[in-house]
Amino acid sequence: MLLNTVTKQLYDGAKGVTVIPCHYKLEYQEWADFGTGSNRPENIYADDSDILSKTTKDSSGKDRLDNGHYIQTTGQHYVLIVSDDSVEQALISMSSSQGKISRGWNSMMMSISLDGKKGPYTPPSFSHAYKLTTVLNSGKGNQWYGYKIVKEGPVTDSAIYERAKKFYTSLASK
């Protein structure tokens, strides 16, 4: 299952959803161990922060600060979820085992090349739609659901394209 935590809309993870990526932000989130903090990040650091230089790896591979909290590198993908009857904004956070998926998605977007008047160019991320599904992963004796992302193709609906562009503009200016 996929859950939009804002609208509480549930989506079938096997069927997936069509998403249009509008903006990406890498951040470092400071967390207290489960059950000891506020169950939300204690601090959030920008991608140009030197916070990782202030950590040491613990026995489980987490980057620990002197206060005992750990830093989790998180890719924040701001998207539009497109269905037959609606278009809604959403945030997809990818960290830990999903970091590789996040980096792969960014590479997939950056590898798109179109021919323009001045030669080849990389279009904005919101020019293409992707199918986001969930798949069962396993490793080190554990199982979890993760994301699978497949490019569907160019956004052909001009109204949706303009909405995605507007969402991008609102986020990129921050």
Report residues per predicted region:
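OB-fold ssDNA-binding interfaces and closely related basic DNA-contact patches used
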Residues: 1-87, 139-141, 146, 151-157
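Short acidic, glycine/tyrosine-flanked loop/strand segments centered on an H-E-D-like triad
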Residues: 79-115
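Long, compositionally biased interface segments
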Residues: 106-174
